[in-house]
């Protein structure tokens, strides 16, 4: 290692063998004039043809300098590459506007016996509001990049000793793949001190045929803990409980079981954790497992006007790096150069310092949804910020492939939103009328779309919230079965294999654009109201009027029908939504009564939940839920 490059922050990494072009663009950009495609013999080396140009202005290899400027003690970073052949390395940076600035360039000539080491130090001072740094390689002869990386100029403070926690539920193959990836790279393997797997399913990870090999590489570091299905919050709470009680690990890394891991992401969040000015949560970003070049979001916040998660200012959902590269003049790409500050990070990849976990306590008993947001907000109240670090990411199933806004998860969305709002919603915008108004709007939309089961379980969500924090903990395991029982009585919650299971629709589908003109919106709304005041035609409950694709199932179409099939978000089945005037009015009145109670009692519930936070987040309280597993010896790999 050179005198300048003292501690690795981020390696240059290359695509896996056989990756498609759109995924390759997350790692490198090749000039269209190159005679042949660059080849990566390993994950950290690249063979480039003669008279070619390759840019590392990419998601995984550009350096997010503004984040390191804002959150760490680093004053500068060093690019260090080892190359053979003849060519040139040019270093560029950007401003927060996306404007590109040349930094410096170096010609190089290296041989197999003596590779050339090219180093460039980049001062971080100009990156207050945004900006990245990257390098390009232009070749004269064939060139091999043997290694490259971004380095700090001083040794990393603290200790690298991570407890990785992967709760799993009936995904043994996915979990085994994640375990295998943890030991696939020596640098990643050596920083992992423990791997904790709470197994909450019936199909056990240890029964998978590939488990013994994956477990053998982890050895005594791996522990499997069987426990009831307590959801993600119960799984992650077990991870934190075991990490604090039975390890000396200084970092706790939460990860989902159903992800595809980029192992270097672990090293990158660890590096930021170690160089951070003060303890903080460091999270990775999420790429779309089905469209791998698509980034879910640069970062998220909680909208304090309605207390709902949303994109952070200047961040947009679903950015496609294959279509809009980082170094692109498109307005969408320019937004990527701003530093995005967040309220929380999803627990698909999130590193929590041991010190923070010891001070804040356990996650809330929310089963799923909002537990990650709560912890980020709770940390901020204790002076611990959260950063969502670009270039550190995993691939996860996109939310667009799920019906979680209308299926059983809708219960947890609303109930837990209310719980977390009661815990953390303060300031001039903390007026529950905004939240209730947004819920009323959503309720009317659900009823117009014949999503009666959604309204029914959301009514239960309000009831359970108003019943108080002790009740919330008591139903940690039982709430989901109760929600399933409620949904079974509504046709819109019964999934059929295909629309062909029913008689053919009475009408062919017609294209309907969303209304934007206020007069047209008013007309469609009036038609829908008048239609819903009349009794439904029983014939349309035996034979649907339309077969509606999921993307077309909007209020302005469904509010004037009595029966229609709607395809599920994953495309694997349909539900037969049927209008029922009596049921609709009953659900509406029940919802309105509960919303009135929310308005009346929210201040009271705010005090009750805040008083209960120390108990809800305590190890002692969580032991009562984890007791069946706590009385067992964990199984080690």
UniProtKB/Swiss-Prot annotation:
Effect of residue 300 to S: 1400-fold decrease in transferase activity. No effect on affinity for the substrate UDP-Galf
Major enzyme class: transferase
Cofactors demanded by this protein: Mn(2+); Mg(2+)
Keyword DNA-binding among UniProt keywords: no
Chain positions recorded as Mn(2+) binding sites: 256, 258, 396
Source organism, top-level taxon: Bacteria
Binding-site list for UDP-alpha-D-galactofuranose: 171, 200, 229, 256
Pathway(s) where this gene product acts: Cell wall biogenesis; cell wall polysaccharide biosynthesis
GO molecular function, one term: metal ion binding
Known EC number: 2.4.1.288
Pfam families given in the database record: GlfT2_domain3, Glft2_N, Glyco_tranf_2_3
Keyword Transmembrane helix: no
A GO BP annotation: lipopolysaccharide biosynthetic process
Subcellular location, record wording: Cell membrane
GO cellular component: cytosol; plasma membrane
Catalytic activity: beta-D-galactofuranosyl-(1->5)-beta-D-galactofuranosyl-(1->4)-alpha-L-rhamnosyl-(1->3)-N-acetyl-alpha-D-glucosaminyl-diphospho-trans,octa-cis-decaprenol + 28 UDP-alpha-D-galactofuranose = [beta-D-galactofuranosyl-(1->5)-beta-D-galactofuranosyl-(1->6)]14-beta-D-galactofuranosyl-(1->5)-beta-D-galactofuranosyl-(1->4)-alpha-L-rhamnopyranosyl-(1->3)-N-acetyl-alpha-D-glucosaminyl-diphospho-trans,octa-cis-decaprenol + 28 UDP + 28 H(+)
Family annotation (InterPro entries): GlfT2_C (IPR045699), GlfT2_N (IPR040492), Nucleotide-diphossugar_trans (IPR029044)
Catalytic center residues: 372
Keyword annotations from UniProtKB, A to Z: Cell membrane, Cell wall biogenesis/degradation, Glycosyltransferase, Magnesium, Manganese, Membrane, Metal-binding, Transferase
Entry similarity comment: Belongs to the glycosyltransferase 2 family.
Quaternary structure and partners: Homotetramer.
Function summary: Involved in the galactan polymerization of the arabinogalactan (AG) region of the mycolylarabinogalactan-peptidoglycan (mAGP) complex, an essential component of the mycobacteria cell wall. Thus, successively transfers approximately 28 galactofuranosyl (Galf) residues from UDP-galactofuranose (UDP-Galf) onto the galactofuranosyl-galactofuranosyl-rhamnosyl-GlcNAc-diphospho-decaprenol (Galf-Galf-Rha-GlcNAc-PP-C50) acceptor produced by GlfT1, with alternating 1->5 and 1->6 links, forming a galactan domain with approximately 30 galactofuranosyl residues.
Further remarks about this protein from its record: Was identified as a high-confidence drug target.
Protein name from the UniProt record: Galactofuranosyltransferase GlfT2
């Amino acid at each position: 290692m050179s005198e300048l490059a003292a501690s690795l922050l981020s390696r240059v990494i290359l695509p896996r063998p056989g990756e498609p072009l759109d995924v390759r663009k997350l790692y490198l950009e090749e000039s269209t004039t190159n005679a042949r495609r660059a080849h990566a013999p390993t994950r950290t080396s690249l063979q480039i043809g003669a008279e070619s140009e390759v840019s590392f202005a990419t998601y995984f290899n550009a350096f997010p300098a503004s984040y390191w400027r804002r959150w760490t003690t680093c004053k500068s970073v060093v690019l260090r590459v080892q190359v053979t052949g003849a060519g040139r390395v040019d270093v560029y940076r950007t401003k927060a506007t996306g404007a590109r600035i040349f930094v410096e360039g170096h010609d190089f000539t290296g041989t197999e016996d003596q590779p050339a080491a090219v180093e460039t130090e980049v001062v971080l001072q100009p990156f207050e509001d945004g900006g990245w740094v990257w390098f390009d390689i232009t070749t004269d002869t064939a060139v091999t990049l043997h290694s490259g990386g971004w380095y700090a100029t001083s040794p990393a403070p603290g200790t690298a000793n991570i407890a990785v926690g992967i709760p799993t539920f009936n995904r043994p193959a996915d979990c085994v793949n994640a375990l295998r990836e943890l030991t696939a790279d020596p640098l990643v393997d050596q920083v992992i001190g423990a791997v904790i797997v709470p197994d909450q399913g019936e199909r056990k990870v240890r029964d998978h045929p590939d488990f013994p090999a994956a477990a053998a590489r982890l050895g005594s570091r791996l522990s499997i803990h069987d426990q009831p299905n307590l959801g993600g919050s119960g799984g992650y709470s077990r991870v934190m409980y075991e990490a604090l009680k039975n390890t000396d690990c200084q970092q706790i890394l939460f990860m989902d079981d159903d992800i595809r891991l980029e192992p270097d992401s672990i090293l990158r969040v660890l590096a930021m954790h170690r160089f951070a000015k003060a303890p903080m949560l460091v999270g990775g970003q999420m790429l779309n497992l089905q469209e791998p070049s698509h980034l879910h979001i640069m970062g998220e916040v909680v909208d304090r006007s309605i207390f709902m998660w949303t994109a952070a200012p200047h961040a947009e959902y679903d950015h496609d790096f294959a279509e809009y590269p980082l170094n692109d003049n498109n307005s969408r790409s320019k937004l990527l150069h701003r530093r995005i500050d967040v309220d929380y990070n999803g627990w698909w990849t999130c590193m929590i310092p041991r010190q923070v976990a010891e001070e804040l306590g356990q996650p809330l008993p929310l089963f799923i949804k909002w537990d990650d947001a709560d912890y980020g907000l709770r940390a901020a109240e204790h002076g611990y910020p959260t950063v969502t670090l670009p270039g550190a990411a995993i691939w996860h199933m996109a939310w667009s492939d799920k019906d979680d806004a209308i299926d059983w998860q809708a219960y947890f969305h609303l109930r837990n939103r209310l719980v977390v709002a009661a815990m953390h919603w303060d300031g001039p915008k903390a007026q529950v009328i905004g939240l209730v108004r947004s819920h009323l709007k959503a309720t009317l939309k659900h009823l117009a779309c014949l999503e009666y089961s959604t309204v029914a379980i959301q009514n239960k969500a309000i009831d359970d919230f108003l019943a108080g924090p002790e009740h919330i903990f008591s139903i940690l395991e039982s709430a989901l079965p109760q929600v399933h029982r409620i949904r079974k009585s509504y046709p819109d919650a019964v999934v059929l294999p295909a629309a062909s299971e029913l008689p053919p629709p009475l009408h062919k589908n017609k294209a309907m654009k969303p209304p934007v003109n206020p007069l047209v919106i008013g007309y469609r709304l009036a038609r829908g109201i008048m239609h819903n005041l009349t009794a439904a035609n029983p014939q349309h409950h035996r034979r649907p009027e339309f077969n509606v694709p999921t993307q077309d199932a909007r209020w302005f179409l469904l509010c004037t029908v009595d029966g229609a099939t709607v395809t599920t978000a994953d495309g694997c089945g349909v539900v037969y939504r049927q209008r029922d005037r009596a049921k609709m009015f009953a659900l509406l009145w029940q919802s309105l009564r509960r919303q009135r109670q929310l308005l009346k009692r929210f201040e009271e519930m705010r005090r009750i939940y805040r008083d209960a936070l120390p108990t809800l987040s305590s190890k002692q309280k969580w032991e009562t839920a984890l007791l069946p597993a706590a009385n067992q010896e964990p199984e080690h790999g």
